[in-house]
Amino acid sequence: MKNIVITGGAGFIGSHVVRLFVNKYPEYNIINLDKLTYAGNLANLKDIEGKPNYKFVKMDICDFEAFYALMQKEQIDGIIHLAAESHVDRSIKDPFTFARTNVMGTLSLLQAAKLYWESLPEKYEGKRFYHISTDEVYGALSMTHPEGIEPPFTTKASSSSHHEAYGEDFFYETTKYNPHSPYSASKASSDHFVRAFHDTYGMPTIVTNCSNNYGPYQFPEKLIPLFINNIRHRKPLPVYGKGENVRDWLFVEDHARAIDLIFHEGKVAETYNIGGFNEWKNIDIIKVLINTVDRLLGRKEGEDMNIITFVTDRLGHDARYAIDSTKLQKELGWEPSLQFEEGIEKTVKWYLDNQEWMDNITSGDYEKYYDEMYKDR
């Protein structure tokens, strides 16, 4: 495979995948396809924009005719599909946008790929459609051990000081879908379409479901960059409910490595879970962020705990996500490489060192959105 489209490549996870592929595979032609919505930012890729094997194309994935023409013109061999609306709060306010982009956009890509690849003499040989999804499609897990227990698995990236599970259950590749938000419902639907194109037409597809990502270049509507910025400026930290909800955290560069491995070596028609083996309650993550930001800014560590502000909980807020990546670990040899404390330190330092990037994003419409989300809670 030489001609690869990466959709959503100007976004958070997508930009890390684009950078990895452009730098690692100079013999590939990498096309970054992105609509450049509020979360798409070409500044994320300034360091590679002049590379000879990189091209950016501004396009809406729902534009079937334009994407089909691109498939023909560039003779596309592989698609890594990351483009999606992904913020749960926004999906609650505007589910139609999520259905359009995540469901119809994915269907548009699938149909264009099908028509182009089936027109070739070799048809699907050497082709691949890789769809990146979320663990939220599985629903929620129970919090049977709110104080934490020893988890059944460990990796070199597991936290040195905080290695706990908050229940015996985990999401597996065989877990039944049970989405609870418009966002997760739209992603579940897109997952089903991808699998249906394999089962019906024989398209070589792969689906992966990942846990919460963190790292550089994440749009500050998500917890970690939002709170790093607020702590820096000593603005209130709006914590849903009591902050007891649990998420599994995966450093974005580890996720990009997994995508690379699965794209090249994963089995067609398989599903792989990609997790960080790091369960944390939201309130505990926030305390780690406060301590880290305070220390790196030369403040007394923990002195900004007083800006934690508990607000009305999110509608349908799932209690716990925890993902089991054992299949990926055993079959392809992947596991996260960065210990959580190291990843958080690296992440916080990046945002503090790149305030101009943050300022450019948090001006204008962002302030209006932020007030709508949190001002009256």
Predicted regions and their residues:
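N-terminal Rossmann-like NAD(P)+-binding domain of SDR-like oxidoreductases, especially those catalyzing
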Residues: 1-213, 263, 282, 346, ...
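C-terminal substrate-binding subdomain of Rossmann-fold SDR/epimerase-dehydratase oxidoreductases
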Residues: 4, 17, 30, 59-62, ...
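Residue-level signature of the cytosolic catalytic core of signaling kinases
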Residues: 41, 50, 216-220, 278, ...
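Short, well-ordered secondary-structure micro-motifs
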Residues: 43, 142, 218, 250, ...
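A glycine/serine/threonine-rich, flexible loop-to-helix segment
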Residues: 48, 145, 220-228, 289
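The catalytic Tyr-centered alpha-helix of NAD(P)H-dependent dehydrogenases
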Residues: 175, 179-186, 216, 220, ...
